[in-house]
């Protein structure tokens, strides 16, 4: 939206069609989500939107390739694109930047164990324009390609533009036994290694200490 509204950018028809845009960028057939490095860019007046996005795309591809080449051994990720997808989830889950390696570690451990990721941002992305700001139990049960409660593994595409920090966190997750996390309500999270500990954290942070309100879930 910011790019489309910028007065010094020359707008082209390619920007309105994802297939045409990605072909222009040398990635035909690729979904555009996640492929543009988020940063502050300086560019001359008269730059076309495709030229601008080509630059952001090239930086993302370079950063992703560099991080992939230096990744930790044994990650449950087959391709750089899978790492990009997971990094986009970490980006959406991490309001506190220092928690990114921990959040990445939880998801990496879940993938290793064959557990579903069960992360709300993917569900919200899959809901598209039907999301009204509230996510309900029925939304978590409604199957879409992006619902990581109903489907195992990663969603089919990134769900956001991951920062360099989130990409690095996925390639170098924290050393932890944590398999769960829950919001403390201040942007940070409580991490748990066991379901019982996670249940207690949910009751404490989300349910005001009222155990009778707990309905399960991961």
Predicted regions and their residues:
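Bacterial extracytoplasmic/cell-wall-associated proteins, especially those involved in peptidoglycan
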Residues: 5-12, 20-218
């Amino acid at each position: 939206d910011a790019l489309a509204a910028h007065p010094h950018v020359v707008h082209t028809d390619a920007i309105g069609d994802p297939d045409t845009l990605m072909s222009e960028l040398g990635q035909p057939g690729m979904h555009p989500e996640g492929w543009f490095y988020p940063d502050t860019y300086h560019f001359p007046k008269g730059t076309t939107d495709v030229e601008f996005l080509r630059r952001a795309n090239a930086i993302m591809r370079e950063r992703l390739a560099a991080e992939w080449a230096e990744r930790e051994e044994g990650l449950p990720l087959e391709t750089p694109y899978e790492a990009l997808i997971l990094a986009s989830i970490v980006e959406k889950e991490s309001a506190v930047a220092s928690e990114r390696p921990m959040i990445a570690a939880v998801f990496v451990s879940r993938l290793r164990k064959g557990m579903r990721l069960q992360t709300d941002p993917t569900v919200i992305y899959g809901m598209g324009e039907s999301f009204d700001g509230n996510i309900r139990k029925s939304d978590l049960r409604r199957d879409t390609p992006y619902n990581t409660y109903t489907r195992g593994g990663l969603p089919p595409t990134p769900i956001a533009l991951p920062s360099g920090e989130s990409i690095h966190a996925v390639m170098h997750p924290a050393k932890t036994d944590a398999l769960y996390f829950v919001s403390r309500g201040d942007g940070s999270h409580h991490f748990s290694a066991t379901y019982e500990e996670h249940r207690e954290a949910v009751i404490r942070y989300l349910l005001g200490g009222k155990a009778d309100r707990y309905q399960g879930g991961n």
